[in-house]
Amino acid sequence: YFHKVHAAVAGIFAEDIPPLLPGIPLAALMLYEFSLGLYVAKGNPKNISGIRDLTRSDVILANREKGSTSRIYLDKKLKELQISSASISGYQKEFVSDVSTSAFIINKNGDTAIGEKAVVLKTNRLEFVPLLTVPMYLVMETASLDSPGFQALIDIARSEEFRMSLHSQNCYDTTYTGELIYL
């Protein structure tokens, strides 16, 4: 951060944001919510239904890089379920996008990955096993809210045109779009 960024998009839960920027009063503008889940091959041939299936010896994971929404969720869930990452084949191999993890599965190099539903909607070779709904925020310092530029961003996020643009992509929930919360 180092006061070089005025706003950042964060696909994580609101309570996970303040520890990343300790001591800085923050505001988070809800952009949309999206479904995060498992990518599996068409027909789900290995019957993968949840995180515990990642420990099976016949399942290879295409993992995302540290700091990505998918990886943050996976690491939190593994800790919660007391599952060692060492028990997951493919955990150490990192990919930098949902598109690259999905290609790994389509090319039959792996069996599953965690990512957002939007990627699966662009191919007929994958299926999606939903795990949870994740918010996407625009995060900024509270002091910035009075700046004309930030007010313009808020106005855009609250506009019907913005909501319709998100709806047209068929994978984003705009129920809370435009809501501002203080962290």
Name each model feature, range by range.
Residues 33-35, 126-155, 174-181:
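Periplasmic-binding protein-like
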Residues 1-49:
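N-terminal segment of the mature folded domain
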